[in-house]
């Protein structure tokens, strides 16, 4: 599915634009997606993921090897 983080699963949300006159029109809040390449030391190759900024922080915290193994366990990579 388009515009969805491969790690966290975050996708677009729906909300309202609110004008000064308090008129409301529908809008979409899109996730901050980035294409990033990550080096897997164990496999000696690059992995390209479409991730949000929150997922980048998660990868910094737990490591790319752990994140990729979790994705493979879910069957998403």
From Swiss-Prot:
Pfam families: Ribosomal_L28. This is Large ribosomal subunit protein bL28. Keywords: Ribonucleoprotein, Ribosomal protein. InterPro entries: Ribosomal_bL28, Ribosomal_bL28/bL31-like_sf, Ribosomal_bL28_bact-type, Ribosomal_bL28_sf. One of its GO terms (molecular function) is structural constituent of ribosome. It comes from the Bacteria. One of its GO terms (cellular component) is cytosolic large ribosomal subunit. It comes from Methylibium petroleiphilum (strain ATCC BAA-1232 / LMG 22953 / PM1). GO terms for biological process: translation. SUPFAM superfamilies: L28p-like (SSF143800). Belongs to the bacterial ribosomal protein bL28 family. The keyword Ribosomal protein applies.
């Amino acid at each position: 599915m388009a515009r969805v983080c491969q790690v966290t699963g975050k996708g677009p949300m729906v909300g309202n634009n609110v004008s000064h006159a308090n008129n409301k029109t529908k809008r979409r809040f899109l996730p901050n997606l980035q294409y990033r390449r990550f080096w897997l030391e164990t496999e000696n190759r690059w992995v390209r993921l479409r991730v949000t900024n929150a997922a980048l922080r998660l990868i910094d915290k737990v490591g790319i090897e752990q994140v990729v193994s979790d994705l493979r366990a879910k069957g998403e990579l």
